[in-house]
């Protein structure tokens, strides 16, 4: 068995590659490449291996799209490939290609304590189910269960479940967005574009015309307290994040914890801490007491996708992760 394996975390814009120490899971020599500068993912990998003069026989690549078979076609990029053909072309003995949130979920058992921030609840119960979700360009969701001392990630497209309002204000948001979009999924409000949808719906429901704002503009105005509509949108975003996380916790009784990943929330961490997130997480009527002890964590590790891809591969190779 080789000392190092190749791991990757590939999104619509960038491809992050690194080496993973197989024995320890340590991530080394990480580098980010622009996906726009290469014709294929295989070309990026060859470039990385050439630059680092690395010989590897095992690899795990996490990609932001559903993985349903040998043929992988990225949702937000032109790259498409056969897993078997790529494995052969790269001379690998073993190539795993997994969903990006499968990778993030697999990082949970190996996350250092200093790489998470807790938002309420008590201590996680070892070996109990875990939920992980995150808002970025879209809304990613996964669950994690421990079976016979092995962690199994339950991948899915949970971000596309129905948006379920639970207040008059949220009812108004749904009415506006339904008129525009037809089906309104959770991702339509819990993502970068979703924050824009919330802002627009708030303004339209008041019979006014919204400005053309980007997510960063809405966040900046909310934090500066210079726009009431933007502040309402960001506050509502935090509340709906809580409601959605509570739903995930109920699905599998996730006493192992609920983890938040993704690029949006860390940009307004102090606002998030003071928001209605935790109250909304527990706002489940007769099951409020059930949720009070379930801890919620924000992942602050800079590269959870790479860490999780390494953990996924190491477990496949026979290593036992923390329970």
UniProtKB/Swiss-Prot annotation:
Annotated keywords: ATP-binding, Cytoplasm, Glycolysis, Kinase, Nucleotide-binding, Transferase
EC number: 2.7.1.2
Pfam families referenced in this protein's UniProt entry, alphabetically: Glucokinase (PF02685)
Reaction catalysis annotation: D-glucose + ATP = D-glucose 6-phosphate + ADP + H(+)
Gene Ontology MF annotations: ATP binding; D-glucose binding; glucokinase activity
Name of this chain's protein: Glucokinase
Residues that bind ATP: 8-13
PANTHER family: GLUCOKINASE (PTHR47690:SF1)
Family membership: Belongs to the bacterial glucokinase family.
Annotated GO biological process: glycolytic process
Domain of life: Bacteria
CDD domains listed in its UniProt record: ASKHA_NBD_GLK
Localization per Swiss-Prot or TrEMBL: Cytoplasm
Cellular component annotations (GO), alphabetically ordered: cytosol
């Amino acid at each position: 068995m080789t000392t190092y394996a190749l791991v990757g975390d590939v999104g619509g814009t960038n491809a992050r590659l690194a080496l993973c120490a197989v024995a320890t899971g340590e991530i080394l020599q990480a580098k980010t490449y622009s996906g726009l500068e290469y014709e294929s993912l295989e070309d990026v990998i060859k470039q990385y291996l050439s630059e680092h003069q690395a010989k590897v026989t095992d690899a795990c690549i996490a990609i932001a799209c559903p993985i349903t078979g040998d043929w992988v076609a990225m949702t937000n990029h032109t790259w498409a490939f056969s897993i078997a053909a790529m494995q052969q072309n790269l001379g690998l003995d073993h190539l795993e290609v997994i969903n990006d949130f499968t990778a993030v979920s697999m990082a949970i058992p190996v996350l250092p304590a200093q790489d998470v921030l807790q938002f309420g609840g008590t201590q996680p119960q070892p070996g109990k189910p875990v939920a992980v979700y995150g808002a970025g360009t879209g809304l990613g969701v996964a669950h994690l269960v421990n079976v016979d001392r092995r962690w199994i990630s339950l991948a899915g497209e949970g971000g596309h479940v129905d948006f379920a309002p639970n207040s008059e204000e949220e009812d108004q948001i749904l009415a506006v967005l339904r008129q525009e979009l037809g089906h309104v999924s959770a991702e339509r409000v819990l993502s970068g574009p979703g924050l824009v949808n919330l802002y627009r719906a708030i303004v339209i429901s008041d019979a006014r015309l919204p400005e053309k704002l980007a997510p960063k503009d809405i966040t900046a105005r909310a934090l500066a307290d210079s726009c009431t509509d933007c502040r309402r949108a960001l506050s509502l975003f935090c509340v709906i994040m809580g409601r959605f996380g509570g739903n995930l916790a109920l699905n599998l009784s996730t006493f192992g914890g609920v983890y938040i990943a993704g690029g949006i929330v860390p940009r307004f961490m102090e606002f998030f801490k003071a928001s209605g997130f935790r109250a909304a997480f527990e706002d489940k009527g007769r099951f409020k007491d059930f949720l009070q002890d379930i801890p919620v964590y924000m992942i602050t590790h800079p590269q959870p996708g790479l860490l999780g891809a390494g953990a996924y591969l190491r477990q496949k190779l026979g290593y036992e992760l923390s329970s």
